[in-house]
UniProtKB/Swiss-Prot annotation:
One of its GO terms (molecular function) is butyrate kinase activity. This is Probable butyrate kinase 1. It comes from Caldanaerobacter subterraneus subsp. tengcongensis (strain DSM 15242 / JCM 11007 / NBRC 100824 / MB4) (Thermoanaerobacter tengcongensis). It is an enzyme of class 2 (transferase). Pfam families: Acetate_kinase. Keywords: ATP-binding, Cytoplasm, Kinase, Nucleotide-binding, Transferase. Belongs to the acetokinase family. It comes from the Bacteria. It catalyses: butanoate + ATP = butanoyl phosphate + ADP. The lineage of its organism: Bacteria, Bacillati, Bacillota, Clostridia, Thermoanaerobacterales.
Length: 357
């Protein structure tokens, strides 16, 4: 086929990112910002559908792009039921689940709905790629010490998978031929064991497992946490916020920005140095535990996410884990490219689209 034009739609809480790719090369990327005032009119996230769709159409018109030129539309996948990794065709069942939002209200739920609506009018395919609910855990990885609590797979699937594919390619191999450990360092930190193309274990980076991060508490001594819950000082919502949003570095140092922490260290703040080092230490420890999951057969370790831009922080992790396997660094995250690549693999026949059921 000739060059494919792919429209990418990635709704976030206060913005919608839109891009057009020609094959895997970006033609443009735009961030449409939505004020709190604009969004406060809508009771549920699903109610923002028409408002956001219109904003996208207006922007495409400004850019002189007609939907009739587009070969496929790909949206950010939302909170669906657990599914295996891949590129999925948006179907009625998926739309129904996203509209019900039984697994949670999140702006990413709109990605598939908007993509489908625009694609339907022009008879082109709509896809989603590797949503956060990707679940390829082995049964043994789900078990905890309490039968009422099962471990869940919630992680930065889109970026982890995209970086794992890139790393495999840099090794001259296919993703399903290698064993990798990928650490995503962002507002949350997720470390995944990728065995031959499947993430067979990963810490639940959202709900309090693994390393603490700039704004999440990570794994904690359980009984001390229970005591805190019953201290009478906090409501359920306050405790939740303490763990997710106000935990980790922000709880210790009052900022969730690692660059600010480095300024504190430069000014001689010994406590800031210790906290930062502890975050690197816990991340390295999690990488070590994933090496055990892979029985020591690790081809490479990939470090990605916003914090990977910081060479000193990467060094702190690297010096603890490079005995396991070579360490490759891919700073930042490019969700738009990862989504476009997912659609591209299907359009070129490299991968078959999956069906959500």
């Amino acid at each position: 086929m000739g060059l494919a034009l792919i429209l990418v739609i990635n709704p976030g809480s206060t913005s919608t990112k839109v891009a057009v790719f020609r094959d895997k090369e970006p033609v443009f990327t735009e961030t449409l910002r939505h004020s709190t005032e604009e969004l406060s009119k809508y009771k549920r996230i699903i109610d923002q559908f028409e408002f956001r769709t219109q904003a996208i159409l207006d922007m495409l018109k400004e850019k002189g792009i007609s939907l009739s030129q587009i070969d496929a539309i790909v949206g950010r996948g939302g909170l669906l039921k657990p599914i295996e990794s891949g590129t999925y065709i948006v179907n009625e069942k998926m739309l129904e689940d996203l509209k019900k939002a039984e697994r949670g209200e999140h702006a990413s739920n709109l990605g598939a709905i908007i993509a489908y609506t625009l694609a339907k009018e022009h008879n082109i395919p709509a896809y989603i790629v590797d949503p956060v609910v990707v679940d390829e855990l082995e049964d043994v990885a789900r078990i905890t010490g309490l039968p009422e609590i099962e471990k869940q797979s919630i992680f930065h699937a889109l970026n982890q998978k995209a970086i794992a594919r890139r790393l495999a390619s840099d090794l001259g191999k296919r993703y399903d031929e290698v064993n990798l450990i990928i650490a995503h360092l962002g507002g949350g930190i997720s470390v995944g064991a990728h065995r031959k193309g499947r993430v067979i274990d990963v810490n639940d980076a959202l709900n309090g497992e693994g390393p603490f991060s700039p704004e999440r508490a990570g794994g904690l001594p359980v009984l001390d946490l229970v005591k805190l819950c019953y201290s009478g000082k906090y409501t359920f919502e306050e405790m939740k916020k303490k763990l997710i949003g106000k935990g980790g570095i922000v709880a210790h140092l009052g900022t969730n920005d690692v660059r600010e922490v480095y300024k504190m260290i430069e000014n001689g703040d010994k406590n800031a140095e210790l906290i930062l080092d502890a975050m690197a230490y816990q991340t390295a420890k999690e990488i070590g535990s994933m090496a055990v999951v892979l029985k020591g057969k690790v081809d490479a370790i990939g470090i990605t996410g916003g914090i990977a831009h910081n060479e000193d922080f990467v060094r702190r992790i690297r010096e603890r884990v490079e005995f396991i396997a070579p360490v490759y660094v891919y700073p930042g995250e490019d969700e738009m490219l990862a989504l476009a690549e997912g659609a591209y693999r299907v359009l070129t026949g490299e991968e078959n689209p999956k069906t959500y059921s």
